Regions:
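S-adenosyl-L-methionine
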Residues: 1-41, 51-58, 80-106
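Class I SAM-dependent methyltransferase "Motif I" SAM/SAH-binding loop
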Residues: 46-48
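Conserved SAM/SAH-binding beta-strand->alpha-helix loop
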Residues: 71
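Short alpha-helix immediately C-terminal to the canonical SAM-binding loop
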Residues: 75-76, 159
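A short glycine-rich, Lys/Arg-flanked "PGG" loop and its adjoining helix->strand segment in the class I
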Residues: 131-145
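Class I S-adenosyl-L-methionine
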Residues: 162-164, 169-229
Length: 229
């Protein structure tokens, strides 16, 4: 998400410091220590300004939600929402998704949300798409077997590509829809989703059941090199 730089970013970040995890790698394998009574650990990749994040945490007080966002200008808005709602079960981290396995232990996550990621439409950038099989490999290592990935996008070509990737990895896909809100609002919407739904743009959604699968070593190596470049 691209946003204008905020002149008062640092003071605002400081006021929300209780919601930010500065060294997430230190919690690898022990994220539940942040909320010992939680029944599940959910992770949202790319939370943006946090509408979905805050409302999901509020609706599921027994769940620990970790929200990932690389744009600090967006993250601070999301953290302020959590603070203003006095939420106790959500925390935020700045993390490159390519480093998932450095932050979360195998099978530590119960559910992963991928909402409206960058579609990277050019074919040469396909490996940057968050539903590329190399990323799916990382998700299925950190999400427990039988856990789920919930994926939403307004981009039809990305959704079609993603379904092909899920199938190529042998992953079960369920509750597939190409027009989620056709008969009325379903579930919690992101801010981005609200805007596009209001314009009549169909929202694609599906759920993927995680399980281990084998990714060719050469493909995994190439993708990791691409992310580091």
């Amino acid at each position: 998400m691209r946003m204008r730089k905020m002149r008062n970013l640092e003071p605002r970040m400081e006021k929300c410091a209780a919601y930010r995890i500065d060294r997430p790698e230190t919690l690898r394998g022990s994220w539940r220590s942040l909320k010992p009574d939680c029944t599940a650990l959910w992770v949202e990749v790319g939370c943006g300004k946090g509408k979905f994040t805050a409302e999901t945490a509020q609706a599921n007080p027994d769940v620990l939600l970790i929200a990932v966002e690389r744009c600090r200008e967006a993250m601070v808005v999301a953290m302020e929402k959590a603070r203003d709602m006095a939420l106790k079960n959500v925390f935020f981290i700045d993390m490159d998704v390519a480093k998932m396995e450095e932050i979360f232990a195998p099978g530590e996550i119960d559910r992963l949300f991928i909402n409206f990621p960058d579609p990277w439409p050019r074919k040469k950038n396909a490996k940057r798409r968050l539903t590329h099989r190399a990323f799916l490999d990382k998700y299925c290592r950190t999400v427990r077997e039988g856990g789920e990935i919930h994926f939403k996008t307004d981009n039809a070509p990305l959704f079609a590509y993603s379904l092909e990737e899920f199938a190529a990895c042998g992953l079960e896909v369920k509750n597939v829809t190409h027009d989620l809100h056709k008969d009325g609002i379903v579930g919690i919407m992101t801010g981005y989703e609200e805007k596009f739904h209001a314009l009549g743009t169909p929202i694609n959604r599906c759920e993927i059941v995680c399980k281990p699968f084998v990714l060719p070593p050469e493909e995994k190596k190439q993708t990791e090199g691409k992310e580091e470049a």
